[in-house]
Amino acid sequence: MADSIHHSQRAQGSNNFDVSELTNAFEQLMRNKRFHRLQEHSRARTHSPSPSPSQVSSPGPYAPPHPSRAPPPPPTAAPFQPPQYPQQPQQYPSNQSSMLQGLPIVPSPPQDQASLKFRNLLHVLSVTPTKYENPGLLDEALSLIPLDRLYSEAEEESQILQAQAASVGGRPEWGYQDCVIRSLLRWFKGSFFQFVNNPPCSRCFRPTIAQGNTPPLPDETARGATRVELYRCSEMSCGAYERFPRYSDVWQLLQSRRGRVGEWANCFSMFCRALGGRVRWVWNSEDYVWTEIYSEHQRRWVHVDACEGAWDQPRLYAEGWGRKMSYCIAFSIDGATDVTRRYVRSSAKHGAARNRAPEEVVHWVILEIRRKRRENLSKTDQKRLMKEDEREEKELRHYTASALAAELNNLLPQNQTTGRLDEQKTPVSRQEAAAEWLAASQRNSGHSGPDHSQGGR
């Protein structure tokens, strides 16, 4: 009888299970696990005996046989030639699980060719956001932005969020500066930049067919074209060729106002910087890029995808599109950060192999870029950025712990039909209601421009 009562009490407790309790327990378990691993590693290094001379000189189980017991030589006198195998590029075992679980990583400089190649790539990519600091470029961008419209929309949205928060006795979800960037996002996607798949024929405006790449012309190279795609008009009577330079220079993007994901993220990030925002340009190794903007109101970095018009939806790519991602590195004028854990919550489901370099090398390169970008800053700014790094690392670890806790909680029988309890793939919240209200008011006043973006990527 007592056993049945005890069993019913346990069942009742499981029904009232709180995910936050499991999250805290999991984080404590991981801290203890890391501590014990470090202790064992230190103990093993302290007590490991050094090999004696006899042990060093004694043959192992795979040592060559003694000459007296060696098989007779082959009848031919030709020297033995070992088989030659083609050289394979060095691959590293994927450290996705250890990276996402926040296990301690000791930074280590790159030693092999593959690690050095990845280090050079990250250093080249880290230069991109430094180009946004050109005062002439920022002034040119500001001259193209309808500031009065953006500030008016931001003020309206900010007041709506404040009223909604006051009605429930809470705090507004976003601050005024966040609303300014959100208004910029709507204008940039709807009125300024155009997505290009196959550029139309400039002679007859008919669709074109891809013909591959072609070398850039000197004029295109001077304007920052990294490569040029060639297209042929689909109309047989026309047959004209259309060139589509892929510009990386933001100056040129202000003139062309068209491109694909790379051009969208590059130009939009610069516009955010022109409005005074702290900006990150995020590179994904699976050929995608986007933007992060720092929210002073929430004291964290917010995901922004100008091409998709997405705001604060970091799980869009992995869980919304089903993409598997390995590296997501954010670059800014203050350094670099590996933000993969923000966009890949479940390494088993959505994580790709991280085998371009050991995790120790990746961490070392990240710190190297930070030191390079911050070496001329004041001690006060360096300390502020260091605290931000610590706060963000805590945030990223919480994402991983919460995702694992939610998966464990979903395994419980009473939660199998309730779905996920953590953050939604496309969060619906108060700011979306405010955005819908603003969009409706713009349609009524004829204020909003057309959306020139095309389908496809």
UniProtKB/Swiss-Prot annotation:
Biased composition (Pro residues): 61-86
Region entry Disordered, spans: 30-111, 410-457
Presence of the UniProt keyword Cytoplasm in the record: no
Cysteine pairings via disulfide bonds: none
Single GO biological process annotation from the record: glycoprotein catabolic process
Residues annotated for Zn(2+) binding in this entry: 201, 204, 233, 238
Pfam family, one: Transglut_core
Keywords: Metal-binding, Zinc
Gene Ontology molecular function terms on file: metal ion binding; peptide-N4-(N-acetyl-beta-glucosaminyl)asparagine amidase activity
Gene3D superfamilies named among the record's database cross-references: 2.20.25.10, 3.10.620.30
Regions of compositional bias (Low complexity) in chain numbering: 87-98
InterPro entries: Papain-like_cys_pep_sf, PNGase, Transglutaminase-like
Signal peptide: none
Any one GO CC term of the record: cytosol
Domain of life: Eukaryota
Family statement drawn from the similarity comment of this UniProt entry: Belongs to the transglutaminase-like superfamily. PNGase family.
Name of the protein: Protein png1
Lineage of producing organism: Eukaryota, Fungi, Dikarya, Ascomycota, Pezizomycotina
